[in-house]
Regions:
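A conserved short coil-to-beta-strand element within the FAD-binding core of flavoproteins
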Residues: 179-193
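Dinucleotide-binding Rossmann-like beta1-alpha1 core, especially the glycine-rich loop
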Residues: 55-138
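Glycine-rich FAD pyrophosphate-binding loop
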Residues: 31-51
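Core beta-strand elements of the Rossmann-like FAD/NAD(P) dinucleotide-binding domain
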Residues: 10-12, 202-212
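Flavin (primarily FAD) binding-site architecture
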Residues: 215-230
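C-terminal catalytic lobe of FAD-dependent flavoproteins
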Residues: 153, 159-161, 169, 228-279, ...
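Extreme N-terminal leader/targeting segments of oxidoreductases
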Residues: 1-14, 29-33
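Glycine-rich Rossmann-fold phosphate-binding loop(s) that bind the pyrophosphate
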Residues: 18-20, 42
């Protein structure tokens, strides 16, 4: 894909290590303030933790139990902001919280929801209220023993697409984004840093210079800090594995459920990709290498048991059509319980004689990524005199500049412009790309004009767009991170997609 013009001297203001939500968010913020930015990700964007979340933009209702009022307030403010800036990939969800006798008392739930409603200074989503589950349609999927509960609001997000959109906007503002490129080593030299990069495809090495380094390596933050950068730090990361399962749709309706468990944890059941239900997450301490991880049989059984405590329809491991796991790099606050570890973030700056800073990101949650990025650049501001002010709070993400942030109006307009699209395909394109969907459809007057047809409504035109503009190189990049069409793609279609990508690379060579 086309990259921003490369500085022939190999010099940058900021080298960002890591292409997850924090790395791309920081790169975007920095580039928009006028810094020369290089972001390196050794795999694909959002390949690990950032595509393995519960896919919620939320204040974190359960964090109130741990008195994290500042975190919840900040997250609620960001929820409102992001809903406005990316209405295609973020949308409101109504949650059902059943009162489960013997667990948290009803008064505690009421107090928590009252705080949740009122910690948000600005609120566009409906507030909480009590609901009688035996007479309300939202109670129909639940067991008869659950007679009352509460409704409240939060938001859904396409997590991996949020990462990609931040990278796209960073590049549009001058950043250079390199995927499949690892930072092998970086050391202070002269007035800045000198780093050795290795291209994962060609194996070629390259040396670049940067004034400052941001270590946003996620689960590898400590390894990168001590190994790649050669810096000792008192800040530590605590790795927590979280797993989710996807099953055929458990219930009718667009509401999600938040289910209390006897071990004090909560589990979400969320409508997913029209025909499925997403269930998660687990919280398991993790001490192995934080690479690709998979759900364990014990985690699968646990999540099924959690559903079977509350839903009338029972599920078992045989019902799972897909699962995913990720390792969350939380700041180690010495909490005894994995679920109690803070989701707040710590930004650790190591410098030498007041220069050559390296900022490392510990912890954080996807909801507050924009604020984290803003905070990170503010911490680096003393090293860049004349840096432009913060700007991301009012800037839509790519595809999100819809009048009034009105997704439904945009979808209706897209259907008028491309009446040949099946309704579901039009909705999927509008959700995934927002106003950029028009780039994929440019010049098309029929489905045939969009090129080769793959399963799930994917077309050659969409694939080519993803290769040109979104750093997609492999079928997995497209089927599991740029979309979730892997749930609808058979082996024959996947093989044709791989062949299409191979032909495209050969033609571009």
């Amino acid at each position: 894909m086309a990259a921003a013009a490369h500085d022939p001297a190999g010099a940058y203001d900021l080298l960002v290590i890591g292409g997850g939500i924090n790395g791309t968010g920081i790169a975007r913020d920095a580039a928009g303030r006028g810094l020369r930015v290089l972001l390196c990700e050794r795999g694909d964007l959002a390949e690990f933790t950032s595509s393995s979340s519960t896919k919620l933009i939320h204040g974190g209702l359960r964090y109130l139990e741990y008195y994290e009022f500042r975190l919840v307030r900040e997250a609620l403010a960001e929820r409102e902001r992001l809903l406005r800036l990316a209405p295609h990939i973020i949308w409101p969800l109504r949650f059902v919280l059943p009162h489960d006798e013997g667990l948290r008392p009803a008064w505690m739930l009421r107090v928590g929801l009252f705080l949740y409603d009122h910690l948000a200074r600005l609120r566009t989503l409906p507030g909480s209220r009590m609901v009688r589950l035996r007479t309300s349609p939202v109670g129909a999927p639940l067991q008869a023993r659950l007679t009352r509960g509460f409704l409240y609001s939060d938001c859904w997000v396409e997590d991996s697409r949020l990462v990609v959109l931040n990278a796209m906007d960073a590049q549009a503002r001058g950043a250079e984004i390199r995927t499949r490129t690892g930072v092998e080593a970086a050391r202070r030299q002269g007035e800045g840093w000198i780093a050795t990069l290795r291209d994962g495809a060609s194996g070629r090495s390259e040396t670049v210079r940067a004034t400052a380094v941001v270590n946003a390596a996620g689960p590898w933050v400590s390894e990168t800090l001590g190994g790649t950068l050669g810096i000792d730090s008192r800040a530590a990361v605590r790795l927590i594995k979280g797993s989710h399962i996807v099953v055929p749709r458990l219930y009718e309706g667009e509401q999600a459920y938040i289910l209390q468990q006897p071990d004090t944890r909560i589990i979400f059941a969320i409508p997913y990709e029209r025909d499925f239900t997403l269930i998660g997450t687990t919280d398991v301490p993790y001490e192995a290498e934080p690479g690709p991880v998979a759900i364990s049989p014990e985690e699968t059984r646990y999540l099924c048991d959690c559903i079977n405590r509350s839903f009338a329809r029972r599920i078992g491991p045989e019902d799972v059509v897909w699962s995913y796991s990720g390792v969350r790099p939380l700041y180690d606050d010495a909490a005894a319980n994995a679920s109690a570890v803070t989701r707040d973030y710590v930004l650790d700056v190591a410098e030498a004689d007041g220069t050559r800073p390296a900022l490392s990101v510990f912890g954080g949650k996807i909801t507050t990524y924009r604020r984290l990025a803003e905070h990170a650049i503010e911490k680096l501001k003393p090293y860049f005199p004349g840096l432009a002010p913060a700007w991301t709070g009012d800037a839509p993400l790519p595809g999100g500049a819809m009048p009034g942030a009105d997704f439904d109006a945009f979808l209706a307009a897209l259907r008028r412009e491309a009446p040949f699209l099946p309704d579901e395909t039009a909705r999927r394109l509008a959700r995934a790309y927002g106003t950029n969907a028009r780039e994929i459809l440019r010049g098309a007057r029929s489905l045939a004009d969009l090129g080769e047809a793959f399963d799930g409504g994917l077309t050659g035109a969409e694939v080519d767009y993803l290769v040109r503009h979104e750093w997609a190189r492999t079928p997995d990049d497209i089927l599991w991170r740029r979309s979730k069409l892997g749930l609808r793609t058979g082996p024959d279609s996947a093989a044709r997609l791989a062949a299409h990508l191979t032909r495209g690379r050969a033609e571009a060579a």
